Regions:
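Flexible, processing/modification-adjacent segments and terminal tails
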Residues: 19-33, 37-43, 51, 59, ...
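A short, surface-exposed beta-strand/turn
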Residues: 68-71, 92-95, 189, 233-248
């Protein structure tokens, strides 16, 4: 048995908390249904994101990023506090040969055109810029909960009403089992190909195989069996704004209980009515 297959067997056989009923609270399902409708009606939004993501075995320092987003995937990112303070990023499908326009905001500062899926662009982010948005986050949560519910596994619980960032919110929690599969990497493939074929996040696949010393999509070799988790997280905690019906915070944990993603959404405003200037590097408010 190869290493990946053995690891998956161990993962599936690992002791867990005592078995609980596959509980899906009506209040939580209603909150997710309202969230789905709100996301479908979101044409653009602005917010201040605070994120912390797992790097190796430690959470990276907090990053504060101002975001403008517009369908289908126009996006402007400006890091206002954190390790890359001053950095600005622009991306739009079909523009700039589908590359990021980036400048780091510190000396020596110059514009770069960057592959959004390349190791440099992915060095400090779990998610490639073409796949970053609040709407995609909602889709990810809904997809995982629906698939678990359909298989009568996992849980979705209503945890009550709270106040977060001065906003009334509903808190829900979801769990999913540590199931998965082990496809074999073919010649010329990377983990991006496995991610595309399976519909799983490349980061989640990379994290599941961390014991093998892989820290980039191109590290595994042809013939390697790759652990691909069926679900994005072992546990997620979601705070949904009671007025906007969109997430204002989410915490995602792996199946060993480690927090690997924490996202806060501050000053969220939807359907702003952005113009092409908001995604133009020539905008005088930007420093490209």
């Amino acid at each position: 048995m190869n290493l990946a297959a053995l690891a998956l067997v161990v993962l599936l056989a690992a002791p867990s908390a005592p078995s609980a009923p596959h509980r899906y609270d009506v209040e939580a399902l209603d909150a997710l249904d309202a969230m789905a409708k709100a996301a479908a009606g979101t044409n653009d939004y602005a917010m201040r994101l605070i994120k912390r993501e797992l790097r190796d075995t430690e959470l990276a320092p907090p990053e504060t990023i101002v975001i403008k987003w517009q369908r289908p995937q126009r996006i402007y990112l400006h890091e206002t506090d954190g390790p890359r303070q001053g950095q600005e990023v622009l991306y739009a499908p079909g523009w700039n040969k589908n590359k990021l326009r980036v400048h780091k905001g510190s000396f020596p500062d110059f514009n770069l055109n960057m592959d959004p899926y390349g190791p440099t662009a992915m060095a400090h982010s779990h998610h490639p810029v073409p796949e970053i948005s609040l709407v995609r986050l909602v889709d990810l949560v809904l997809d995982n909960v629906k698939r678990a519910h359909a298989k009568n596994v996992g849980t979705l619980t209503f945890e009550g009403r709270e106040t977060l960032f001065g906003r009334p919110v509903t808190r829900v929690e979801a769990t999913a089992p540590p199931t998965g599969k082990t496809p074999t990497l073919e010649k010329g493939q990377t983990l991006w190909d496995i991610a595309k074929a399976t519909g799983q996040s490349m980061y989640v696949i990379l994290h599941a195989n961390r014991h093998r010393g892989w820290w980039q999509a191109g590290h595994p070799k042809s013939g390697d069996a790759v652990i691909v988790p069926e679900f994005y997280a072992g546990r997620l905690v979601l705070w949904i704004d009671d007025e906007l019906h969109l997430p204002v915070q989410i915490d995602l944990y792996d199946h060993e209980g480690a927090l690997y993603e924490h996202y806060e959404h501050h000053e969220l405003v939807v359907n702003v009515g952005f113009t092409p200037d908001d995604f133009d590097p020539k905008n005088p408010k930007y420093k490209f």
